[in-house]
Structures are given as structure tokens and as C-alpha cells.
Amino acid sequence: MAEYNWDERHIITFPEENSALTTKDLHVYYGEKEAIKGIDMQFEKNKITALIGPSGCGKSTYLRSLNRMNDTIDIARVTGQIMYEGIDVNAQDINVYEMRKHIGMVFQRPNPFAKSIYKNITFAYERAGVKDKKFLDEVVETSLKQAALWDQVKDDLHKSAFTLSGGQQQRLCIARAIAVKPEILLMDEPASALDPIATMQLEETMFELKKNYTIIIVTHNMQQAARASDYTAFFYLGDLIEYDKTNNIFQNAKCQSTSDYVSGRFG
């Protein structure tokens, strides 16, 4: 691998009113190991931001910190601020369950519940005691339409979610996440288990979703990052190296390490 100046950085910022989420001096530790090294970063509203970098660079760890998923790891410790709507999501007194209604997550592999398609969508509402069938029906239809799945499943809503294809299951998981009307949707390599056609359909769904949501996606697929995102951030060994409009990252990167990574020269 070529010698790089790892102190070189190029990180764009946005006016505060355009930012859906901001991290300030965010560190993540696994025991004594520092996995994320003091990242300052903003995410623009109603845009898709891709997080890229070689395996082990910290991009998924960073993504998981944004809605406190690292809380489930005993040895994980997160310091710094995660600012959403003027509130520090990383504060100890935050109701994490309520916060995740605003900052949702779609995981790497489709993980539908062992329930019907309908019950997957209504799960959070029914858990909260909502019984209004008309309201629940509307939530199901709206969420499935936004996830581009309604036309395929509208006559099979009470069949098991496991009868769906992998791509359909992933879009069901997106519908389940957006059913509670989050403002931000986190996606951790959502297409990694999908075939090319299902991946294309997922990306088309993302383009529609960004009209209403801010999307942050981790991907190992450079072509996907180039196609599907407005902004791209390059991570390396826990550091944010470069963050810019996607066209700039792929065609005119300011840091040599970024240019070499996206062109396949290392990583």
C-alpha cells in the first residue's frame, strides 16, 4: 500500500438548520480499544449519506452508535455527543426505546419477525396498546407503499413474512422501521444479502424514501455508494478521512487515500 498522510482531512459541514443529525467528538471504545476516534460529522436532511471504508474501519460501529445500538455490547463505551433536534442522544437520561422511533435501523440481513406481514408492520403500535384497526390498516398500507412493497403483498397481508423473497423481506423490514415515522433511517449494508435485481429495487426505494427521511447507509459496494448516495464519507482505522458530495469523492477526492480506495488501489 502506498504511503499516505493520514493527518490529511477534508470534511464538509452544513448550516445547523440543514443538519438532521450531528456527532461531536464521538469516540467508541471496545474495552481498551478505541474503535472510533473523535468524529465530528453532520448529516444533511433528506439526503442519502454513504459510509465507506475497508473492513474494520469503524463505519458500522459509528452507524450503530447513532441510535445507541452499541448499548447492547457489554464492553462498548461511547463518549461525545450525538445531537438530534437539540437533544444529545448519547445522554444517560435518554429513553432509548422512544429515541429509536425517531432514528430507525435496518440491518444487514433481513430480519422479519415470525409473524404475518401485517403484524410485522403493526408490532410497535400493538405493543404500545394501539387497537384502532382503521389506524393500523392505514399504517400498514402507507408503510408498505413507501417501501415499494404494497402492490406485491396487498392480497397476502396475513401470510407469514417468511413467505417473501429476500429482497421483499428487506423492504418489509424498511416498512416496519418507517411505520413509526422516524426522521432518520440507518441502514447497515442492507443489500449485502440481496441479488442484483433486488439491490436495484432497494436503491430505487431509497430514492423515494429520502423525500421524507434522512438516510445513512453503510456499504462495502463502491458502485452502490456512487449510484445511490448524495454524500459519501470515507473511514479508515476509526478516523473520518474525507466527507463530501459523492461526485467529488469518486471523481475529485481531495485526499489521495480516498481516491485510491474508491478506485480499488487498496482496501
Curated annotation (Swiss-Prot):
Name its cellular compartments. Answer: Cell membrane
What's an example GO BP annotation here?
A: phosphate ion transmembrane transport
Q: Which InterPro entries match?
A: AAA+_ATPase, ABC_transporter-like_ATP-bd, ABC_transporter-like_CS, P-loop_NTPase, PstB-like
**Sections of the chain in a coiled coil:** none
Specify where it is mainly localized: membrane
So where does ATP get bound? Answer: 53-60
Q: A Gene Ontology molecular-function term?
A: ATP binding
What Gene3D superfamilies does the record point to? P-loop containing nucleotide triphosphate hydrolases (3.40.50.300)
Top enzyme class: translocase
What Pfam families is this protein classified in? Answer: ABC_tran
Q: Which residues form the ABC transporter domain?
A: 21-262
Membrane topology of the entry: Peripheral membrane protein
The family note in this entry says: Belongs to the ABC transporter superfamily. Phosphate importer (TC 3.A.1.7) family.
Role of this protein = Part of the ABC transporter complex PstSACB involved in phosphate import. Responsible for energy coupling to the transport system.
User: What is this protein called in UniProt?
Assistant: Phosphate import ATP-binding protein PstB 2
Q: Which organism is it from?
A: Streptococcus agalactiae serotype V (strain ATCC BAA-611 / 2603 V/R)
